[in-house]
Design a protein with these regions (language model features):
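A surface-exposed beta-strand-loop module
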Residues: 1-26, 115-130
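Hydrophobic helix-coil surface modules that form long, contiguous segments used
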Residues: 40-42, 46-47, 55-168
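Loop-rich catalytic cores of soluble enzymes, especially ATP-dependent carboxylate-amine ligases
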Residues: 51
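Short edge-strand/loop segments of extracellular domains
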Residues: 17-38, 86-88
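Enriched for extracellular/lumenal, surface-exposed ectodomains of secreted and cell-surface proteins
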Residues: 4-8, 39, 43-44
Length: 168
């Protein structure tokens, strides 16, 4: 079994933690490099065992991830990969906006007005968001009831995928 305590980012800095907003009691959680994994092995140096010193990156292998993240019901989750259960976590209107995303201009999936209303509402229960990512170095995610979400298709002719969906 394994546990990971999420620490307030202001206390330690780094690549993960949470930020608490005292004015309304909400939080933003953001996590990168948050789970244990084997170190990388290279044919020229063997096992990579250098300590992480904060300026740089770990040596990581590429991998495939299928991740379920359970958060308070009002949270919007941003994560590496493709959202697999939009029907369970987004409203019908938000799913429609996501489906209509194009390369001409950004589209709000969660509007600023919806984010403000969501932030003010008292939510009960939890919701699980599911993501899948193929051939990536790491899996990172963020979660908050404060999030505004927009999306836009990015054209990349000649690449393995002609279009990718950019989310922020």
């Amino acid at each position: 079994s394994w546990r990971f305590n999420i620490i307030e980012e202001a206390a330690i800095g780094g690549r993960g933690g949470y930020e608490h907003f005292k004015d309304n009691g909400t939080d933003i959680f953001f996590l990168a490099q948050w789970f244990p994994r084997m170190v990388a092995y290279t044919d020229y140096a063997g096992w990579q065992h250098k300590a992480f010193l904060g300026r740089g990156e770990f040596t990581l292998e590429f991998g495939d991830y299928d991740v379920a993240i359970t958060v308070p019901k009002g949270h919007i989750v941003s994560a590496t990969g493709e959202l697999k259960n939009a029907k369970q976590v987004l409203t019908a209107k938000q799913r429609q906006r996501l489906a209509q995303t194009n390369a001409a201009q950004p589209t709000f999936i969660v509007t600023p007005e919806e984010a403000l209303a969501n932030e003010a509402k008292q939510h009960q229960g939890q919701r699980t968001w599911r993501f899948s990512a193929k051939k990536v170095r790491d899996f990172a995610w963020a979660s908050s009831e404060k999030f505004i979400w927009d999306a836009m298709l990015h054209e990349q002719p000649g690449a393995e995928y002609d279009q990718v969906l950019a989310l922020s």
